[in-house]
Curated annotation (Swiss-Prot):
Substrate binds at residues 159, 191, 228-231. This is tRNA (guanine-N(7)-)-methyltransferase. One of its GO terms (molecular function) is tRNA (guanine(46)-N7)-methyltransferase activity. GO terms for cellular component: tRNA methyltransferase complex. Keywords: Methyltransferase, S-adenosyl-L-methionine, Transferase, tRNA processing. It catalyses: guanosine(46) in tRNA + S-adenosyl-L-methionine = N(7)-methylguanosine(46) in tRNA + S-adenosyl-L-homocysteine. S-adenosyl-L-methionine binds at residues 80, 105, 132, 155. Catalyzes the formation of N(7)-methylguanine at position 46 (m7G46) in tRNA. Belongs to the class I-like SAM-binding methyltransferase superfamily. TrmB family. The active site is at residue 155.
Length: 251
């Protein structure tokens, strides 16, 4: 019996770099690896990652990305954190060829599926990263370089004792605000009302951001945000969906 070759995609599946924090939730510059127990990476997804990473994938680095070099233009860059299987991200890239999209996802089946769909649709204005988002924001994204941040249906960690694990925290939003250009946007969506209320509280408290909602809370689902499988799941479960759209002030 021949031993199966460990490919690039297999290595991505087994380890991913994550950030660590102090007891009060502040980021500290220390990196460790851990075994990521994800869903099965199909042979098709594995091949898509192995064969297309050079053109669609980016690796973590300790210096800021040069977006002009990466995309070959100076179009605005929109970052999406946690794109799942990537269908809506690819669709947004297709609908907006005058914008560049950068997606972060730690689960390799989703990364493989996103790359496959991007290849199928011949998308050129999209790059993906399989790495912890906090590390990428800290080291790879220059201040005042992003036109927008999208965070759609992140894990709600609905148990109270797990709320500290939610990605939306004051220090996270503070970091996002630093990375946005003036008039850059933060667009979040969730199908958990408690998480929506918490997102609203954190975003409203952030210095340098203002809410675009006419009622100073949530906005109707915008036409430019494609329906995701998580949103469809929420509808089936009778959940509402809450969109938040904040803009960075011009100072």
């Amino acid at each position: 019996m021949t031993e199966q070759k460990i490919t690039f995609a297999d290595q991505k599946r087994k380890t991913v770099e994550i950030a660590e924090f102090t007891e009060d939730g502040r980021y500290k510059r220390k990196v460790r690896s851990f075994v990521l127990r994800t869903g099965r990476l199909s042979e098709f997804q594995r091949n898509m990652m192995n064969n297309n990473w050079a053109t669609l994938g980016l690796e973590y680095q300790t210096t800021a990305f040069d977006f002009t070099q990466i995309y070959g233009n100076t179009n605005p860059v929109i970052l999406e954190i946690g794109f799942g299987m990537g269908k809506s991200l690819v669709e947004m890239a297709l609908q907006n060829p005058d914008k560049n999209y950068l997606g972060i996802e730690v689960h390799t089946p989703g990364v493989g599926a996103c790359i496959a769909y991007a290849v199928e649709k011949q998308v050129k204005n999209l790059r993906v990263i399989c790495h912890d988002a906090t590390e990428i924001l800290q080291d790879c994204i220059a201040d005042n370089s992003l036109a927008g941040l999208q965070l759609f249906f992140p894990d709600p960690w609905h148990k109270t004792k797990h709320h500290k694990r939610r990605i939306v925290q004051p220090h996270f939003v503070e970091k996002i605000q630093q990375k946005l250009v003036p008039n850059g946007f933060v667009h979040m969506a969730t199908d958990w009302e408690n998480y929506a209320e918490y997102m609203l509280e954190v975003l409203t408290s952030a210095v340098g951001l203002h809410n675009t909602s006419a009622t100073n809370d949530y906005i109707p689902r915008p036409d430019f945000r494609p329906l995701t499988k998580f949103e469809q799941r929420g509808h089936k479960l009778g959940h509402g969906v809450w969109d938040l759209f904040f803009i960075k002030n011009i100072t």
